[in-house]
Structures are given as structure tokens and as C-alpha cells.
Amino acid sequence: MSKIKIFALGGLNENGKNMYVVNVDEEIFVFDSGLKYDNDINLGIDYIIPTIDYLIENRKKIKGIFLTHGHDGNIGGIADVLEQLPEVPVYGTKLTLKIAKKDFDSELIQKTKLVEIKPHVKIDFGKNAIFPISVTHSIPEAVCYVLYTPDGAIVYTGDFVFDSTMMGAYKTDIGKLAYVGKQGVLCLLCESFYADKQGHTSPNNRVRGFIRDVIAKTDNRIIATIFPAHYYRIQEIFDEVSRTHRKIVIMGKPLQEMINSAIDDGYLVLDRDRIGTLADIESKNAIVLISDEKEKPFANLERILKGFDKYIEIKENDTIFITEPSYAGIEKRTAVIMDEIAMLGADAISLSSKKHLLHHASREDLMLMINLMNPKYYFPVKGEYRNQYTNGEIAEELGIPKENIILKLNGDVLELVDGENTNSTEHIETDEILIDGKSQSDIGNLVLKDREMLGENGIVIISCTLDKDTKEILGGPEILTRGFIYVKESQDLLEETKKISKEVIEENIEANSKRVDYTKIKNDVREVLGKFFYQQTESKPMIITVVQEI
């Protein structure tokens, strides 16, 4: 018998940033390592991942990180995590690992252990075992995971729909799911993204007919945007390209490499004669395909709309086709993009989130999964809290006792001892790491506050040069301001700023000339000038002090 703890470091009461931890006695299994996008378009945050302090502290217990599929919400943070936990093996299907590796630098590739899994092949860890099962999603080779423990199976669904038309690498193995359910499921962690949607997601996840109508009604160039790694949508577009004998022009080296590799591996099907070059980009017959790597959605399209792309310029008779319905987390970005398209006089077409759905489980899909699994405990994950709650209501309607439906927030622990819920109030500390551009660092709320300060109150930079040996001031202090005051009208204020800065610097040097504490100088200048500026202007600019020795 075992003590099992289940909790999320990310993914609860939010869309994206999925990372779920199952601790079985002294063994830890981590499921997914995702990111989410920031919905605030003004603060320069490209994506967000969860903190992993718990995993770092317990790194020797981790048996592996198990990735369900190759979308950012599930694998987008794996490179950042492995920078801190390079010894932890990562498990995934061939395609999932291939996509994940795109974010690895050469050093990380060398020191990371990636283990390719096959659906329906058990991975043994002694008294525990992992069993992956194929599920249907918008990308090939998506899986759910069954973690076999001495007290029963714990199932994490990942993202899924039930769609009997899907074949090959998109097909759900419903027989294997039913078999697991008959053996007995202790706890089912099931996605909640579309728990509020009635019926099955299929066929509303398939938009080939809509794409066909757009192409049929458009005589001019079409610029189509796709989300990264949405293979199913790309194939729908390719099918219509082939049918209408248009040329597809793929923008950007990363997207070109991804598509070429997918065609080589059989994940996408397209006659290469249909792939155009930059010479075809101005053609009325062209369909230009645009996507983004791991940064804010629509970044490449936005660059084109602003005239910053050297290969393509938006024209009034162009049609911009956003091929994915919007969802919580990117609504602001979508609205901004639609406005920018309208300002340029081009036509904008987007999918309605009411009529068209992503490949996530709706109410009937969830009901089928619950009936197949028949779990003792039901743990809604992956989605806003209201959707988790609705997901729980669906389970209750199907006969799962309300006390066995687990509604949690990130860090809240479900503890099962000998298969029974202890109603633990334990909470694992978790927070967010905000990633800015290509830097893999914790920006934190302080930097966001700085950015707000810059926008509202401007910046003042004080620079000063000291003699390396005597510590005498050789130059400055010089004052540079941006967005704070009108320099020509504020000479007295600037002179007083220089005087105050010089006094603070000299006082610090006199206090300890042998070992000057430059950090203290910067802090003291910021504190004194901050009070002075507020007294004089009622503003609080960002203050930066630069002291150099020569």
C-alpha cells in the first residue's frame, strides 16, 4: 500500500502552463512541462512557466517527465526546466521529442536524456509503471498516461477528443482505455478546457469546409496564420491547396523546416510541387502560411502588418485568414490584430469560437472518458476554475460521489493513503516565471512594475566616473532623462539633481574610501533623488546610477 500525493505546479485555473506531479512514496512522476502566453500585450512578457522549487528539492526522486504531445501548453517550458534539472529523463513519442528539442541548445541536447516511447508499450519502474495510450488531438502521436501504482491506476488524459473519423497517428485506442477502466482506476486527471461546451467537439474541430469556402470566394492572395504545431489544421489547408492547384508559400525558416520534416516523416501529406518560393509570394494564386515559434501569438503577422518584413507587404485586396478560434489567454492579441488588419484595408476572416472548436474534450467527450475509466476519484485539470467546476458537475451527474470530485488550485495537494483521501490541507509553494524574449530568467513582478514606471513616469540615469586609485570624481555626475521632464524648461531641477547626486556619492566615498560599496551608492542615490523628484514634480521616475572607475 502507498502514500500518493497529486498536485499541479501549473495548469489549474488557467489555460496552459501544464505541469502535474504524482508522488508515489519515494518516486516522483511529472506529467507535461508547458508554458502559457501572457494576455497583457503591454508589458513585454513572451511566455510564462511554473516555478519548480519542489522538483529541484526532490530531484533525486524524479523518475521522469512524461510529455503528452507537442504543443506549447504541454512542452513549451521543458527546455527551461531541463536547464535546472538536466539529469531528469524526458519521455515522449518520436514527434513530441522532436518538437521539444527545437528549444534545446547544443549543450542541453548533450546532457539531457530523451527516451522515445511507443504507445501501448509499458515502461517499468519497479513497483510502479507507466503505460501510454494513443488519443486524438490536433497533432499526431498524442498520448494519455496511465501510472500503475500498488493502490490502482492514476490516469492523466492530456488533451483529447473522441472522433471516429481519425486514423493513423491521430486515432484514439478506445479499447485500451476501456481495458484500463475495467482493471480499476484510482484517480482520473481529466482536461476541462471545453467542459462548458455541449455535445461532442467533433465535427466542430474540423474546418476543411470553412477553409474551402474561404478559398473559393477569394480571387486574390490569402495570408493564413496557424498556431505552432497544429498539424491537423495545416493538413486541412494543404488538402485545399492541392484541390484548387494553388501554391503554398511557407514563411520563415522554422516553419519551413517543421513542414519539410513532417512531410518526410509522413505526418503531413503534400505534393512538393505545390510548395512555392518567394518568387510566388506576390501571386494572386498564393496562399502564404505564417506561424510563430515560442513567443507571443501572431508576432510574425504583427511584424508584417507593421511593414517590418522584407519579403511581404499587406495590400488592400489581400485576405488575412486566422485559422484558429480565439480562446482565453489570447483574446487581447486577437483583437489588436483584427484592428490592425482593418486599418490597412485588407479583409480579415477568423473562425468563430462559438462555431469552431479546438481539439479539446467537450461535455459528451468527457462523459465518455469518465464512463470508460469509472474512476474512484475524479480530478478536473487543464482549464479555468469555472471549467474545472463544470467538469466536476459532469462527473457527479454520472454517479461519482461529490466528495470524490477533487477541485484544487495550483499547489494544493490531493493525498491518498492506501487508496483513501486523507483530506490533506498541504500546499506546495508555486509561482510563475515570466520569460522575456529569449532570456530564460525570472522577470518577476518587480520588472513588470519597472516597465509600468517607465511608461508612466520616465527614467533618469546618473553617470559618474571615479579615479580607480584615489576615488576622486573625474567626470560627472551627468544626468540623462527620458519621458520625465522637458529638459529646456527644467535646468534648475537638473542642476540640483547633479548637486544632490554628487553629495551622496562623495559621502559614501568618505565613509569608506578603501573599499567603496557601489551597490550602496546606487541605492542611496535612488532613495534621495526619489524623494526629491516626488517633492518637486509629484512623479516617480525610474532612477539608474552608473559609477565607473578609470
Q: What do the predicted segments below correspond to?
A:
Residues 60, 128, 182-183, 283, ...:
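Structured loop/turn residues at beta-strand edges in well-structured enzyme cores
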Residues 14, 139, 282, 454-456, ...:
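Solvent-exposed loop and beta-edge segments used for protein-protein assembly and interaction
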Residues 104, 395, 533:
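Conserved hydrophobic residues forming the short capping helix/wall of the S-adenosyl-L-methionine
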Residues 197-323, 327-352, 356-374, 379-493, ...:
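Hard-cation-handling environments
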Residues 1-66, 71-279, 299-310, 332-334:
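His/Asp/Glu-rich metal-coordinating catalytic cores
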